[in-house]
Every structure is written in C-alpha cells, then in structure tokens.
Amino acid sequence: MKESVAFQTRARTIDHLGREQIADVPTAVSELWKNAYDAYAREVSLHIHGDDVPVAVMLDDGHGMTHKQFLDKWLVVGTESKEGNDSVPKELRKGLTERPKQGQKGIGRLSVAALGATALIVSKQAGNDFVACLVDWRLFENPYLLLQDVKLPVISFSEAKDLLIL
C-alpha cells in the first residue's frame, strides 16, 4: 500500500517555538520591537500596569495589519513575508526610507507568550477596520491538542470604542 501523508503538528509546537526559545522578558520585548521597526513605527512604548496581576501594554505607531493580513501573515508561523521582495508600500512608510527587515524567521511574534498567559492583539491599517484577537497561550502547552484544533477568536470593528463593548 502506498499513500501520501502530511506531518501533523501538536499545538505545543507554538510553545516550543515561542516562549521556550525566549531567554527572558527583555528578549521577548526586543522581538516585538523588531516587529514594530519592520512595520515602520516611529514610536514604540511599553507600559506595565497593576501590582497583583500585572498587565503589559505595548503600543507602536507602525502601519498595522488588515483583517486579511492578520489571518494570512500573523497567524501563519514561518511566513515568507520576510523573504524576497515583500517591501512595504511607500504610502505605509510614513515618509521613512525603506528599512532592512529585522525579523528573519517569521516566529518573533510568538515571543509575546513569554510576557504572560494571555495576549490581546489589536491592529489597524489606515483606511481599514481594526482587527483584534485574544490568544490564551496556555492552550499551546497541551501535549494532546493538535494545532489545527486550536481556534482563536478574531474580530473586526470600525472604532476603538467598539473594543470596550465587546
């Protein structure tokens, strides 16, 4: 009998590639700053709130992502977007000259798992709706769950105030 089969990936592979590869919090933050740089951000900030349950908020003014880009790039591990000539269009660079990309393997975004058990990712590209996704990184610690079985809630909305209602 001859058959063609595909690899299957356990959800914990995301944990192995993300949190487990990050030495410490400064390294995780550095990876996220690289992503902001690649998005032509002029400003990046990190704010830590609370004592009992600290909440970290990282903000940048990069070009952001559309809903489709979030699904097709951010949620695809090892994307080819850093390869070849996938340059950022001039109108999204905010007057900045073309930058060499800092991210190289398409997995730096997974470093956010080293900062806490959950992450709310919110992005917006000019002329498009906001996109938001809540990620519970603990799901990716389950050794029995296949990656394809982890479903993340992703929503789009038009105004920032709408996020508070959701």
Please provide the spans of the model-predicted regions.
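GHKL (Bergerat-fold) ATPase N-terminal catalytic module, capturing the glycine-rich phosphate-binding loop
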Residues: 1-166
